[in-house]
Amino acid sequence: MLEVLKPLASLWHIIAFACGFLFVFQSYLALFGQVRYDRRHNRIIRYADRHLWLSGFAIIAIGLLINGPETYLSNPKLWTKVTLITIWAISTETIRGYALPRLRLGQRLPMLVAGTVSLACWIYGAFLGVAHGLAYGKAPLWALMAGFPIVLLGLSILALKLKASLALSVDNP
């Protein structure tokens, strides 16, 4: 029965990811004037967040039952994901409690920074979700963790380029 529940929980997680990522990415692009911001997306993003947490806990519970706590909890990929989710949760709360109020006052930089960290978490989290070959010690924790700053650096470079192109389009209408 658990072998059937595991892919169903994974499907639930993928659907929540897809719905959330679509609107998170659109909101991110709106910071650069690439698309129009739509406040209605916030509700969908929060709903997706909730379902990512619930489905993630379900996946962990099923993994613990199938593999046993000793094996499942010794997986460096699991702890990389836990670390990444912690960073994502902090960035989400930073967006809601700090960056969004600043954005409403016309200060975009806090939202750009927090949004870039959040988007990097979404992208690297998706990679870890499908990188089954790296599980159970096939890649050490340090190597798995090293991928996140690389993704964050890439997105930061992209953000700088988008910000520069926005400045050019404002200066040269």
Role assignments for model-derived ranges:
Residues 1-173:
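Polytopic transmembrane helical bundles with strong interfacial aromatic enrichment
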